[in-house]
């Protein structure tokens, strides 16, 4: 198989370096429920702001509730922030089960949380930290949320 070595721009109506609000411009997500991991810092908080700006009900799991509540003050209510630590699978399962009971439908899942270039460490279950948090934790969350 040959892969083209020349890229051609496509007209999406979105600039090459869009703001989060530009990406959701024109959308109406009223009545939709979104889950954003890592939603209390960096790209995650901008994602939460963009989704709420077009009507979505956004839930943010966090391993540091106080930090998340402070960061998201004025963006989403504190009761839409739940305790979850992606490095601890029972915590992930507990959050997923609580979410599933509280919200019968999940319309949007954005798995944004992650760690990078961290020193060698292990999760509660003995997995390498980066693999456990970035991949296995999110996979476990998805499995818990699926019917």
Language-model features: locations:
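Non-catalytic terminal and boundary segments that flank Rossmann-like NAD(P)-dependent oxidoreductase
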Residues: 1-35, 97
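Conserved glycine-rich cofactor-binding loop
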Residues: 33, 40-41
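A glycine-rich helix->loop->beta "capping" turn
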Residues: 76-79, 98-111, 117-122
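Amphipathic alpha-helical dimer-interface segment in Rossmann-like NAD(P)H-dependent oxidoreductases
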Residues: 133-147
């Amino acid at each position: 198989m040959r892969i083209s070595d020349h890229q051609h721009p496509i007209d999406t109506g979105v600039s090459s370096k869009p703001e989060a609000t530009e990406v959701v411009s024109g959308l109406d997500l009223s009545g939709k429920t979104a889950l954003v991991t890592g939603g209390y810092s960096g790209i995650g908080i901008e994602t939460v702001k963009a989704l709420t700006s077009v009507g979505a009900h956004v839930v943010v799991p966090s391993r540091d509730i106080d930090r998340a509540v402070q960061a998201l003050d004025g963006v989403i209510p504190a009761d839409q922030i739940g305790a979850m630590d992606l490095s601890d699978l029972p915590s992930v399962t507990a959050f997923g089960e609580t979410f599933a009971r509280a919200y019968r439908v999940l319309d949007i899942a954005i798995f944004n949380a992650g760690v990078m270039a961290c020193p060698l460490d292990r999760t509660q279950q003995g997995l390498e930290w980066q693999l456990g948090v970035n991949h296995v934790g999110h996979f476990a969350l998805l499995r818990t949320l699926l019917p």
